Amino acid sequence: MAANTSAETPLPVGEVSRLIGGWIDRLGAVWVEGQITQLSRRPGAGVVFMTLRDPSYDISVGVTCYRQVFDAVADVVSEGARVVVHAKPEWYAPRGQLSLRAAEIRPIGVGELLARLEQLKKSLAGEGLFVTERKKALPFLPQLIGLVCGRASAAERDVLENARHRWPAVRFEVRNVAVQGVHAVPQVVQAVKELDARDDVDVIIVARGGGSVEDLLPFSDEQLVRAVAACRTPVVSAIGHEPDTPLLDYVADLRASTPTDAAKKVVPDVGEEVERVRALRDRARRCVRSVIEREERGLAHTLARPSIEDPHRMVDERADQVASLLDRGRRTLGHLLDRADSELSHTHARVVALSPAATLKRGYAVLQRADGHAVRAPDEVTADEVLRARVAEGEFTVRVDV
């Protein structure tokens, strides 16, 4: 169509609407899934009007059907129900409005819903959205708590009352939203994103007081699960539910079984904390007292030792021992010196008695030839040979006379 138009040769609105209607007619009948809203069954009217909505994308389309088509499922289908309709798209050219004319309506059973949720759960788990490593720790004492819940609901009352009872100073930033029906998902997602964007919000609680599987479907919506996974603020899921667990429980940083349980897990009890501090203080006091008493006993035992009790006595005892040993040493050394002196004198006397000088003193002389050899026999000398004679008091020369 674009090739056949220009600013100079535009198509009239009616022609464009006619072309769109032709394309829609060629689409034929299709099966469409959605959630029923704005159901209108006027008494006596042969046509039923409703809106079929996709809560994940907040897109709606009008649906009409004959009364007998709706009456076939009227007992199990009402506003908020998820259904599959076999319908033919219709284009109302005067208003440029798309609608569906349903020929068959089938409610989606609980079993089928749970099967779809299980498939979605596996898909999201495969992306790693539920792993423990992604979980963020909650602050010990949050100053400001974001609360997403229904307006004037029991869930809101339970969280606020229990939290303030445990810690009166805690503050809340409450976002009241639809917690079931077609508007629940976009409102809850928007509230979570708004609270996560605030730097002063320490933790976010998403609370609802339970319900059927159909009522809790918004808390298993993929859009909400991904929004919570993207939060930088810790998120607590507090959906009081049946055994079938909403997917919000898996992606949240902490799961609480009920709104009351969420208040207890998020906010510490001031009384319990004061008692815990008191108990720790008493325990510390007992530990310190025990250490002091043990050290005092050790010190008393040490002071009771003789060396510490009367240190001078030990010194005096050792001084007497030193004096006794010193005197003993002197006596022993004196005896040794006296004996050594006596032995030395005796040895000296023997040496003197046996020395040549002693012999000379008795009148003997030593004759030596000129070469210094001592004369021992007469035949060792010749006539007129000069010899040197050594006596006790000196020496002189003699001549041999044969």
Curated annotation (Swiss-Prot):
EC numbers for this chain: 3.1.11.6
Disulfide bonds: none
Cited CDD domains: ExoVII_LU_OBF
GO process terms (BP): DNA catabolic process
GO terms assigned for molecular function: exodeoxyribonuclease VII activity; nucleic acid binding
Entry annotated with the keyword RNA-binding: no
GO CC term, one of those recorded: exodeoxyribonuclease VII complex
Compartment(s): Cytoplasm
Enzyme class label: hydrolase
Function text: Bidirectionally degrades single-stranded DNA into large acid-insoluble oligonucleotides, which are then degraded further into small acid-soluble oligonucleotides.
Assembly and binders: Heterooligomer composed of large and small subunits.
NCBIfam families for the chain: xseA
HAMAP family: Exonuc_7_L
Similarity-based family: Belongs to the XseA family.
Protein name per Swiss-Prot or TrEMBL: Exodeoxyribonuclease 7 large subunit
Organism of derivation: Streptomyces avermitilis (strain ATCC 31267 / DSM 46492 / JCM 5070 / NBRC 14893 / NCIMB 12804 / NRRL 8165 / MA-4680)
Gene name of this polypeptide: xseA
